[in-house]
Amino acid sequence: ELYPQKPVILLAFDESEIKQLPEEFQKSSIDSVFIWSGNANVLLAIVKLLEDKMNIKRDIKKADVRCIILIEDSPRYYSLILPMIYKEISHQVKEMVDKSASDHERLLYMRGRPRILLARSYEEAERYFKRFRMSTLGIISDIRFPKKDKLDKNAGVKFARWARSIDPSIPIMLQSKHNK
């Protein structure tokens, strides 16, 4: 514990590698787990996600940036979707910037891109929404994820109802890899 403020990320080849680690090691030593799928963009997404989480308060206060809350507990799925979300945000910001803008202006626009906050449980998503509601552009949520430390097959629907009771106009996209 020489550097307690430094995040520790586990980049695993598949979920079986994670299961081989002792549970107490996973909870005490590892901040985030990602799954390698052969897409090098996951490395950039990991860095951006960490920067977003570390800088969100300051960025909202100083630059009035917005955020998107992603609720997903599956390392495999968020390892796939985060690079796509960051790529799409980057594309949209570039499209928004006037072609006649200087390099400096383009850089300022890119720094103002929406931040992504990854929540892996109902309670974490609730904390993010309560804290950053006025700066939240929208919510992307899985249907099934932990609530009160137990997998809840309707947590996404419950969270959407709760968020809409606070802000009826908040955009919410529910998605699931499960058929039912």
Label every model-predicted segment:
Residues 20-26, 82-86, 180:
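Short, aromatic/basic amphipathic alpha-helical patches
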Residues 22, 29-32, 38-57, 84:
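Receiver (REC) domain switch/output surface
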Residues 65-76, 81-105, 116-118:
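Conserved acidic segment of CheY-like receiver
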Residues 1, 5-22, 31-37, 72, ...:
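A short, hydrophobic beta-strand element within the central beta-sheet of small alpha/beta folds
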Residues 96-138:
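Acidic, metal-coordinating helix/loop segments flanking the phosphotransfer/catalytic sites
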Residues 55-63, 107-108:
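Short boundary motifs at domain starts and secondary-structure transition points
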Residues 1, 114, 141-148:
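Residue immediately C-terminal to the conserved phosphorylatable aspartate in receiver
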Residues 121, 149-158:
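Acidic catalytic/metal-coordinating carboxylates
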